[in-house]
Amino acid sequence: MLVKTTHFGEINIKDEDIIEFSEGIVGFEDIHRYGIIRNQNSDSPFSWLQAVEKSELAFAVVDPFVIKKDYDFVLSDEYVKALDINDPSQVNVYAIVVVPDDLTKISMNLKAPVIVNKDNRKAAQVILDTDEYTVRHYIMDELQKQEV
């Protein structure tokens, strides 16, 4: 699918990389279809969610398990059913990233991960019922902990 974007110009997103949020993303509930744009650097855990219907809307995302090794949560039965998940191997998890001017403050939202069933391309942003994670988990702090 050819998609015109503000950030990447005109790009071709494969059909298998188009995902659908039945309820949208928090704050953007009216936008349902996004394309996953993977980083050209295969070692990078970062990707983009580009709105198909809104050229200027794109979210930087990251595989949270690469950054926070002990990230763990239980997906409610409601979402397992809504996304038709039968096996954990069907799932990709992304955290939305905020990239401020001060890159030392780059953060990811661990409180509301994006869950994608990669088999049927259904997706949902899930707000976790826990105080263990925040919407602003600092990536550089987490990486520094791993170096110690």
Swiss-Prot record:
<dbReference type="Pfam" id="PF02623">
    <property type="entry name" value="FliW"/>
</dbReference>
<keyword id="KW-1005">Bacterial flagellum biogenesis</keyword>
<dbReference type="GO" id="GO:0005737">
    <property type="term" value="C:cytoplasm"/>
</dbReference>
<dbReference type="GO" id="GO:0044780">
    <property type="term" value="P:bacterial-type flagellum assembly"/>
</dbReference>
<comment type="subunit">
    <text>Interacts with translational regulator CsrA and flagellin(s).</text>
</comment>
<dbReference type="GO" id="GO:0006417">
    <property type="term" value="P:regulation of translation"/>
</dbReference>
<keyword id="KW-0810">Translation regulation</keyword>
<keyword id="KW-0143">Chaperone</keyword>
<dbReference type="InterPro" id="IPR003775">
    <property type="entry name" value="Flagellar_assembly_factor_FliW"/>
</dbReference>
<comment type="similarity">
    <text>Belongs to the FliW family.</text>
</comment>
<comment type="function">
    <text>Acts as an anti-CsrA protein, binds CsrA and prevents it from repressing translation of its target genes, one of which is flagellin. Binds to flagellin and participates in the assembly of the flagellum.</text>
</comment>
<keyword id="KW-0963">Cytoplasm</keyword>
<protein>
    <recommendedName>
        <fullName>Flagellar assembly factor FliW</fullName>
    </recommendedName>
</protein>
<dbReference type="InterPro" id="IPR024046">
    <property type="entry name" value="Flagellar_assmbl_FliW_dom_sf"/>
</dbReference>
